[in-house]
Amino acid sequence: MSSPPEGKLETKAGHPPAVKAGGMRIVQKHPHTGDTKEEKDKDDQEWESPSPPKPTVFISGVIARGDKDFPPAAAQVAHQKPHASMDKHPSPRTQHIQQPRK
């Protein structure tokens, strides 16, 4: 088979197709360039914008005020496990020993 011309590279999903030899795929490592990261950082800086204002939240028709309505201590009490009023003891089990037949 002839190799593709150097000027025109056929790509699949943004990368060159896999090379096979003897039915097995051969991994080809390509060195990465640092230019793409710098360009990406520049793009991020250009598109950065301040976060949009948070919308007001209504709970049952009243404006919620965040932690003022639900203090962290109240939430902590709601998530604590209730203590049992009586201690539970395991029921006594009869012990059965498996023995071979005669």
UniProtKB/Swiss-Prot annotation:
Biased composition (Polar residues): 92-102
Chain positions covered by the region annotation Disordered: 1-102
Sequence ranges of Basic and acidic residues compositional bias: 32-43
Protein name: Death-associated protein 1
Biological role: Ribosome-binding protein involved in ribosome hibernation, a process during which ribosomes are stabilized in an inactive state and preserved from proteasomal degradation. Acts via its association with eiF5a (EIF5A and EIF5A2) at the polypeptide exit tunnel of the ribosome, preventing mRNA translation. Involved in ribosome hibernation in the mature oocyte by preventing mRNA translation, leading to ribosome inactivation. Ribosomes, which are produced in large quantities during oogenesis, are stored and translationally repressed in the oocyte and early embryo.
Domain of life: Eukaryota
Gene Ontology molecular function: ribosome binding
SS bond partners: none
Chain positions with N6-acetyllysine modification: K29
Record-annotated membrane-spanning stretches: none
UniProt record similarity statement: Belongs to the DAP-DAPL1 family.
Name of the gene encoding the protein in the UniProt record: DAP
